[in-house]
Regions:
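Repeat-unit-sized solenoid/scaffold elements
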Residues: 137, 143, 181-185
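A contiguous strand-loop segment
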Residues: 3-132, 152-257
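Second-shell loop/turn segments in exported
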Residues: 123-125, 135-142
Length: 257
């Protein structure tokens, strides 16, 4: 196998129930294409429903229905068809569990990232309550490629902010895969999985430095915001080479290094 960059494969947490995602870049896969494997772990009695949602045109002014307290996103004029793996517990759906493959071959799965330091009491870090389930739905409905999905994710998070405390998203197609790890609000770290790499997404933040991978994505204030909140202090003033996203944004008792 080709050289694999040092993606963090460390501890998966202290509980016996953990989602996990494995990603193989196309040069690391025997198929010559990206491979994604995902295990969804949710407690209690869960019904898993599978179905196809056809493409659709929407009237001007349509919005995406959302969980109570979350933002109602404007719907786009046309949405793609997608295969939907839906997890339902009792009579309710699970906002952070469902997976998708759309008609363009874009895959969306996610993992819990435990708790971020951004508290749920900080309503100012999101707009109109922020976005939760509709992030994954919007990706399924709109992404023409995995790279397009990465763009959509960042645009939605930049505008609305992410409502839950911590979550990771994998967005992949046959040629590329992207990992994003989101804190509550508008702060995240993302990376394209190198073609010759095998990557693991556990249940805690494991993206670290600003230049660890050939392609990385983060908001312009990801460092300065952490400094302002007291979550990160550079060893040398003005030098952010020791910045660690996972350490800065993960709740201290859930940081595994």
């Amino acid at each position: 196998m080709a050289n694999t960059p040092a993606f963090d494969l460390d501890a998966f947490g202290n509980t016996p129930m953990n989602c996990m995602t494995l990603i193989a870049g196309k040069a690391a896969s025997a198929t010559g294409h990206v491979l994604v494997g995902h295990n969804e772990d949710d407690g209690g009695h869960v019904v898993v429903r599978h179905g196809w949602v056809p493409p659709r045109d929407w009237e001007k002014g349509a919005v995406m229905p959302a969980e109570d307290g979350c933002a109602l996103l404007p719907q786009v004029a046309h949405t793609l068809g997608y295969y939907w793996v839906e997890y339902r517990k009792d009579v309710m759906g699970l906002s952070n569990a469902d997976g998708f493959v759309n008609e363009r071959g874009v895959v969306i799965v996610s993992n819990s990232m435990g708790t971020s330091r951004e508290g749920m009491e900080n309503a100012d870090c999101v707009k109109d309550g922020g976005i939760a389930f509709n992030l994954r739905r919007a990706l399924a409905e709109r992404a023409q490629t995995a790279r397009d999905g990465a763009r959509i994710l960042m645009e939605l998070i930049d505008e609305w902010g992410y409502a839950p405390s911590g979550r990771a998203y994998t967005i992949a197609d046959r040629d590329e895969a992207f990992m994003f790890q989101l804190a509550r609000g508008r702060h995240y770290m993302g990376a394209r999985v190198p073609d010759d790499a095998i990557a693991v997404m556990p249940n805690h933040f494991n993206l670290h430095g600003l230049t660890d991978y050939p392609e990385q994505f983060y908001p312009a204030d990801v460092v300065t915001y952490a400094i302002a909140r007291g979550w990160y202090t550079p060893a040398k003033n003005g030098d952010f080479s020791d910045f660690d996203f996972a350490k800065a944004y993960q709740a201290e008792d859930e940081f595994f290094g």
